[in-house]
Amino acid sequence: MEELTKLIIKWHHDRNLIEGSSDKDQVLKLMQELGELSDSVCKGKDVKDDLGDMMVVMLNIMERQGISMED
């Protein structure tokens, strides 16, 4: 999981999603992903991708705030 986390954070930096974005933008993205998760749950669909998308956005917010998974 640690290596995957590092790769996701690198992906964010490579696409300027840390310096070129804001916490507000990322929280709005997280809420969008939560809506997709809610829709999947209500429809009885698989939620693995929705949860993964939320984790990616949360890792972005954590990186912006200087918080690690160990914290």
Residue ranges and their predicted role:
Residues 1-71:
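Flexible "arm" and connector segments at domain edges
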